[in-house]
Regions:
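Long, basic/Gly/Ser/Thr-rich N-terminal segments
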Residues: 1-153
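N-terminal pre-Walker A segment at the start of P-loop NTPase domains
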Residues: 155-182
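Short hydrophobic/aromatic beta-strand immediately N-terminal to the Walker A/P-loop
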Residues: 188-190
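P-loop (Walker A) phosphate-binding loop of NTP-binding proteins
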Residues: 194
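Conserved lysine of the Walker
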Residues: 199
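Post-Walker A alpha-helix
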Residues: 202-203, 207
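Conserved nucleotide-sensing/catalytic segment adjacent to the nucleotide-binding pocket
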Residues: 210-216, 220-276, 281-284
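ATP-dependent NMP and nucleoside kinases share a basic, alpha-helical "lid"
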Residues: 270-318
Length: 356
């Protein structure tokens, strides 16, 4: 967030939300917008214990607010635990959000310039001189992380962690998974959606948080003998769902190991098996994962919609022109016909937007 208009809008909204804030609270929000998490990360168990204890101390003042900061981050208030998210999952997301921001100082300086411009124009509850002097002191100290002011703590009882925005979008899914895994010995989750909607990225995040196996529908393209005109006329016919059901889903549902055989698109053959143990949590990601033949085997499903404009932008960015053309002319129309004919989006339990 280095665009002046965006910074001004953020600062105005922040001061309006917290009318009793001090200048150091504004600095803290700008620091978090530029650098993200400023806390030292304890081990997973200790971090979860801290979260539980802080939530308990907050009592009835706790909030479920997900508060957007500038840039890639947001504040997620600890009341989110009341929706079923476990402290352990929250702690892992917090740790994964802590990363070194190489351009953090540059971003912070741009935001401070905008802050001073607004103070000079009388748009903030701080004088121009007060702002300039405080910024200079902070700069001379090397921009260390700051605590909230005492007046802020008294008025607003802040209890939150800074997470990446893309992680926070998936919090409803994490909460549902945590509730299910607390109740059941085995949970299967499907991530459905169109090309470039973020299915693989979400699957990787779930794997990083839970250490669970992830299975990809893209490993089950049709074998040469299946690629018939009749097959391609079927909504959802563009995947070897029969092999996926027999070799993967049934095994996972029964808690048996999977001898996972990927389809090799270079040779049009099936690779030798790789043994994968069924987990407590098992993720299936990819278009066609919620085909009616497969859907009954899942405990939870999520659909990732994406606008045509964003989809096109992402596909062009990650593919050579000839390959991108295949998506636009062939694969996306196949997917859209499947989504429409089988009402896939509405049959999923959750919908999480992939658009920014």
């Amino acid at each position: 967030m280095t665009n002046f208009t965006d910074i001004r809008d953020f600062l105005r909204a922040h001061c309006a939300r917290y009318p009793e804030l001090a200048l150091q609270d504004v600095f803290k929000a700008l620091y978090q917008s530029a650098f993200g998490c400023e806390h030292l990360i304890a081990g997973p168990s200790a971090a979860a214990d801290y979260i539980r204890a802080e939530a308990a101390r907050s009592g009835d003042r706790i909030s479920k607010l997900v508060e957007l900061l500038g840039g890639d981050y947001c504040r997620v208030h600890l009341g989110i635990l009341q929706d079923g998210l476990s402290a352990e999952t929250f702690a892992r997301l917090f740790a994964l959000s802590a990363r070194h921001e190489e351009c953090g100082r540059e971003k912070l300086e741009a935001m401070l310039t905008a802050l001073q411009t607004m103070a000079d124009a009388g748009e903030l509850p701080f004088s121009a001189q007060e702002t300039a002097e405080a910024v200079e002191r902070w700069r001379k100290d090397g921009f260390p992380p700051l605590h909230h002011s005492e007046i802020f703590r008294q008025n607003y009882a802040p209890a939150y962690r800074v997470l990446r925005r893309d992680f926070a979008r998936a919090l409803p899914l994490f909460a549902r998974i945590d509730r299910l895994t607390a109740e059941r010995s085995r949970v299967l989750v499907a991530i459905e959606g169109g090309s470039a909607s973020g299915k693989t990225t979400l699957g990787e995040l779930l794997q990083n948080v839970y250490g669970c196996p992830v299975f990809h529908m893209d490993d089950f393209f049709l074998r040469p003998e299946q690629r018939t005109e009749a097959r391609f006329t079927q909504p959802g016919g563009n995947v070897d769902r029969e092999r996926f059901l027999e070799e993967v889903l049934i095994h996972l549902r029964e808690g048996r190991p999977v001898d996972y055989r990927r389809f090799d698109c270079a040779t049009f053959t099936i690779a030798p098996p790789q043994r994968i143990e069924a987990g407590t949590l098992n993720i299936v990601e990819g278009a066609y994962s919620m085909h009616p033949d497969l859907a009954p085997y899942y405990d939870l499903s999520v659909f990732l919609p994406i606008s045509a404009e964003k989809q096109r932008e992402r596909i062009l960015k990650r593919n050579a022109p000839a390959h991108a053309k295949q998506f636009f002319d062939r694969w996306i129309p196949f997917e859209q016909r499947y989504f429409d004919a089988l009402d896939v989006r509405n049959r999923c339990d959750l919908i999480l937007s992939a658009d920014d």
